[in-house]
Amino acid sequence: MTFSRIGGTGRYLPERVLTNADMEKIVDTTDEWIRTRTGIEERHVATDDEQTSDLCVDAAKIAMADAGVDPQDIDLIVIGTTSPDLLFPNVATIVQHKMGIPACAAFSLETACSGFIYAISTADKFIRAGDTKCALVIGAEIITRLIDWEDRNTCVLFGDGAGAVILQPSEEQGIMSTHLGADGQYKDLLYYPVGVSNNLAAAGVGDSRIMMAGNE
């Protein structure tokens, strides 16, 4: 029986850091209030010229070096994110292009905080089925661009970054099993109120339209 194992890991955090002391200057909060309730002392924030795919690439390069694999070895890319560069093409294909990875299955999953868990579970099943030999799995967010910096209940919680692993086949158990689940009745506990079919015009992006090179 074929199992999957993590062959390499990598992470990337933007250089800019906002400490709790910095947050005290932005909203009515304190370092003590944040730490005692969340354990958070600081968070990293992407620069304006950084995209989620950039964070993914930086984390992926480290993971690939750690695993000793090259771009041509990758035959599956799965990324968990709710803050992609674009609605489409999906961010996995953008990362694929930036890293020079040859044609392979590449897709992203939108499951918020559990995105990386869903991504690694999906890649694990590809490997167990014998469809994949070397998977690049990434969880990444530039979530600070969705934050209300005047809402102290949320803005102190989130930061930007990316983590990546290389998943490979193994005769011995690496990932033993995964169990996925969701309960939609709690959908209003944490959400972003704008989507393509909901409130798009109200968000001020109604002039954005699909672009296509029709002859290609």
Per-range role (PLM):
Residues 1-21, 120-186:
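Conserved beta-strand-centric core segments of catalytic alpha/beta enzyme folds
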Residues 1-75, 195, 199-216:
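Conserved active-site "lid/cap" helical segment
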Residues 6-8, 34, 63, 74-77, ...:
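Buried hydrophobic positions in well-ordered alpha/beta secondary-structure cores of metabolic enzymes
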Residues 22-24, 28, 89-97, 192:
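Short, flexible, mixed-charge acidic loops at enzyme active sites
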Residues 35-54, 82-135:
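Conserved catalytic cysteine-centered active-site region
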Residues 57, 61-64, 156-216:
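Hydrophobic pocket-lining "lid/loop/helix" segments that shape and contact the acyl-thioester
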Residues 78-79, 137:
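Short beta-strand segments at enzyme active-site cores
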Residues 80-83, 141, 216:
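Residue-level signal for short, function-critical loop segments
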